[in-house]
Amino acid sequence: MQNPKILVTGATGGTGLPVVRELMAKGFPVRAMVHRRDARSAELERRGVEVVLADLYDPDQLLDALRGIQRAYYLPLIEPYMMQSAAAFAVAAREARLEHVVQMSQWTSHRAHPATMTQQTWLVDKLFATIPGVAHTIFNPGMFAHNFLRMIDFSALLGIYPVLSGEGRAAPVSNEDMGRVAAVLLAEGPNHHAGRRYRPTGPELLSGREMAAIIASILGHRVVPLTLPIWMLGKVAQQQGLDPYLISCLRHYMEDMKRGTFSFEGGVTTVVEDLTGVPAESFETTARRYAAMPFARRTLRNRLRAFVNFNLTPFYPGYNFDKWDRKMRLPRTAQPSLSIDDDQWRAAHAAQMAEKAAPLVTGRRLRVA
């Protein structure tokens, strides 16, 4: 029997690219959807992947991308109007008679969350569950390891590790592990995974200070964990030219971490190993890859750049996130609340964590949600 053809949105991104690679290794035909052609998409084409250019806000382009497709990986846009793109995808999926969608969601997904992206993610969870004839699977990771390693150059070059989450702890999961999990869900399909949700995590809970110690052991020199107030994030983001919308959301996730959202009910699952047969990689393993990247190498040029940028950061005015949110007219609920403060969220997510004790047997190997 021929394997079903699978569409991967965000196919050149942090999780999309690992999904494409894993599916190809499993022998599945893949259509990689990108929003622009570049060296990464060209490399996919050289490897025999069908690449299509489409706008996630355009229902017609999405319908064209979905024609002849049985299953799809949906990666949401990190943009203020993400909900519109999700609605366009839902319309196209129904018209194209898609069999199964695997959706990247969030552990924090909550109707009243102060981060607009998380409010909208909750709506997408509900919307995709109601697409007629389309099976729906959610995987809802917590904190990505990438979020804790994007500033590893500060550690490598200056011997400091910025900590924005206080003493809060999370089990950071790598992009590669998320890609492997999504690929299994897509490959095994709706007969095994329709209507289910899975939370991939790293293998252990870590605080910012513990991450700093791991990074120090990798680099071979002292790294000082530097606790920073959340307003400093606005200065760093502006100095580095980062998207204010993304960082506006990230500040709330740092507060989530402080409050124990990511360590709730133990905070660690075995989903990665249960689904893929391989244990989740450690934070140390992921950090070693980042430490070897060009931006973190201890060259004279990188050292000078890091020194200048670090010393200039306090002089930047920084993003005023609340003002920026108002200017963008981002939707807000009447009474915003962090996920951990909501009884409905706690009940639903406690149940999800408890499900690991109630395995689903597929007939081929054990599955634990």
Regions found by a protein language model. Give the residues of each.
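Short secondary-structure boundary segments
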Residues: 105-106, 261
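Short, conserved active-site loop motifs that form the nucleotide-linked donor/cofactor pocket
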Residues: 48-50, 136
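N-terminal Rossmann-like NAD(P) cofactor-binding module of classical short-chain dehydrogenase/reductase
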Residues: 66, 70-73, 102
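Residues lining the SAM
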Residues: 9, 75, 104, 277
